[in-house]
Amino acid sequence: MTSTMTSDKVESFLEVVREHESPIRIYPEQTAFISKKLQFDWKEVIEGHFEGDDGHKNFVVHDCGSKESSFVYFGSQKWKLAKIHFHRRSEHLLESKQSKDGSFDAEIHFIHAPVKEPIETGDKMIEPSENLVIGTFVVESSTGAKSDELMSFFSACESGEKSVRMPLEIIKQVTKLEHFYFYRGSLTTKPYSENISWVVFESPLQLDKTVLDPICPTTQEARKGQPWNRRFVLRNFQ
């Protein structure tokens, strides 16, 4: 005898069995210290294009070969930058002087795929995940970055340009960040697969409001915070 389940019932069942979901609210006092580094090898030129429907658009990074691609080193692995997407309010929540009840003005997710290449980083930990996602908060600031390059980058989402360069200002700000929180979770959009290692930086990027406003057509709907359950959330700073 076979049984059938409607999509609604399947979704309800998965809501019960899921235990390692994202995003989460980060409580700094409940995190544990771990000596861990993330090393950037991002190039100054990162090109790609926007694709997807409104409400679920990604900046897809063009594959330009192993020498010109952008990578990070985390754990005992090398990860290649593949996609970037944006949320006009942050998905992760973190109590901070620059947040409002834990929420920031925006959040950017830099999605990296594992590279099957032996490397030596000094860190023996292998991440049991299909992707490493680096999350950076963003705050509106009157002294934040503002440039024609930043404006044209987000405007390109609507223009349909086939090749767009990621603003150097974003690359410079992100690659200077050091302090982060780390946990294992899920995609924040369907199918919410629990195969993501998350690095969420403590300090936000500073951008001018006029830069953030054009982000709206590219943004993905923010998912509500999920319970920690029995997970550890770690930090790499004292």
Language-model segments: what does each one mean?
Residues M1-Q238:
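Alpha-carbonic anhydrase
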